[in-house]
Swiss-Prot record:
Job description of the protein: RNA-binding protein involved in the regulation of alternative pre-RNA splicing and mRNA translation by binding to uridine-rich (U-rich) RNA sequences. Binds to U-rich sequences immediately downstream from a 5' splice sites in a uridine-rich small nuclear ribonucleoprotein (U snRNP)-dependent fashion, thereby modulating alternative pre-RNA splicing. Preferably binds to the U-rich IAS1 sequence in a U1 snRNP-dependent manner; this binding is optimal if a 5' splice site is adjacent to IAS1.
GO function terms (MF aspect): mRNA 3'-UTR AU-rich region binding; mRNA 3'-UTR binding
Organism: Mus musculus (Mouse)
Disulfide feature: none
Modified positions (N-acetylmethionine) in chain numbering: 1
Record's protein name: Cytotoxic granule associated RNA binding protein TIA1
Any Gene Ontology biological process: RNA splicing
Principal location: nucleus
Amino acid sequence: MEDEMPKTLYVGNLSRDVTEALILQLFSQIGPCKNCKMIMDTAGNDPYCFVEFHEHRHAAAALAAMNGRKIMGKEVKVNWATTPSSQKKDTSSSTVVSTQRSQDHFHVFVGDLSPEITTEDIKAAFAPFGRISDARVVKDMATGKSKGYGFVSFFNKWDAENAIQQMGGQWLGGRQIRTNWATRKPPAPKSTYESNTKQLSYDEVVSQSSPNNCTVYCGGVTSGLTEQLMRQTFSPFGQIMEIRVFPDKGYSFVRFSSHESAAHAIVSVNGTTIEGHVVKCYWGKETLDMINPVQQQNQIGYPPTYGQWGQWYGNAQQIGQYVPNGWQVPAYGVYGQPWSQQGFNQTQSSAPWMGPNYSVPPPQGQNGSMLPSQPAGYRVAGYETQ
């Protein structure tokens, strides 16, 4: 049993002045060390190392004693490491395990990757945290270039949690990476789903809308929809400026700080499962009102037609990429209702939401009646309502 117990530790967040000799000197005070291997990053990032003990009990004691201790002014991170030999043994002798369904494993999203980072790079970076069942950098199908994010899957949930906590903000290939739980796409059922849903590419999605559009529509979460759930789902893709959820309708809007972050979110989350529901993601429509608020009075209260939506995106046929047959898209007219959705306490119509520093009174209808207000910042592609 002793031979099967881990004896190797990962030691990270080291100062560049730390040497193998110093690490051995410190860790040998806890127990006899078999060897120490220092890994120096050629890109100039902080080094890390692996320390192997002769006995598991000494390794466990070193983990407890050294994790969080300052060495040359830096608080080091110590964890169990998966050595290359044990990694090879596990994968070669566990063909049944390797073919398990992906939902039996625990998946970590890795974002903000440098273009040169490969699958082998992220696998090597996350290997110290436990047994990895899969790792990949997502590439564009057309160009073969990295999309700037990837996934690492662990057999053990604790290993995945630890990797998320320890690796978030660490430098890899010249960039600080972001980590979070990944929302994985479920196996496609034997139905029309696969034929109706096209695998989206980043280059395709990013060009489908104006560079000023940073808003993602996410629909299909018919139960359990909350702002916290949406923030947890979309935060790995970039800074979120605003979230609006409509639990009774089953959809939400997420506004990012950049067009590129929103595009990454659409590509990654579209078709995934959230709270047991397969969701659809595509661009929420931002109107020209946000650029030229003077024209606000002429557009409030009138939903865009199907043709207008297609003209905005340049080609109405592209709608099928985001709205497959049978998917019910909320019409713009839903915003004519008083704000009573989650996050809004008003029960009567109020001034339309124009974004920061904008506010205009609702327009006058016939006989002095007030037309329902609508948020000019958000507009969903949809059909005319009666």
